Amino acid sequence: MSRSLRKGPFIDLHLLRKVEKVIKTGDKKPIRTWSRRSTIFPKMIGLTISVHNGKQHIPVFISDEMVGHKLGEFAPTRTYRGHSVDKKIKKRY
């Protein structure tokens, strides 16, 4: 479900402060965050943000195509291992 246009984009204040601090200092270290709900802004382009997926932090390099999307879209939380094989029809020779 998309966000209403009258509400505008959302970013957590603590993440915005970290981004501005990294831009000001020019540090290349990834920013660790648990804020999957924050929208990617143009000022984040070129930064690496480590997004938590519930188990570990996934490093995400921000490019210009990602602007407007949420950080959580790039750190999947579920692993898909495929459907189980039907044990009755293993191999027919």
Swiss-Prot record:
InterPro entries: Ribosomal_uS19 (IPR002222), Ribosomal_uS19_bac-type (IPR005732), Ribosomal_uS19_CS (IPR020934), Ribosomal_uS19_SF (IPR023575). The keyword Ribonucleoprotein applies. Keywords: Ribonucleoprotein, Ribosomal protein, RNA-binding, rRNA-binding. GO terms for cellular component: cytoplasm; small ribosomal subunit. Pfam families: Ribosomal_S19 (PF00203). The keyword RNA-binding applies. GO terms for molecular function: rRNA binding; structural constituent of ribosome. GO terms for biological process: ribosomal small subunit assembly; translation. HAMAP family: Ribosomal_uS19. Protein S19 forms a complex with S13 that binds strongly to the 16S ribosomal RNA. Belongs to the universal ribosomal protein uS19 family. PANTHER family: RIBOSOMAL PROTEIN S19P FAMILY MEMBER (PTHR11880), SMALL RIBOSOMAL SUBUNIT PROTEIN US19M (PTHR11880:SF8). This is Small ribosomal subunit protein uS19. It comes from Blochmanniella floridana. The lineage of its organism: Bacteria, Pseudomonadati, Pseudomonadota, Gammaproteobacteria, Enterobacterales.
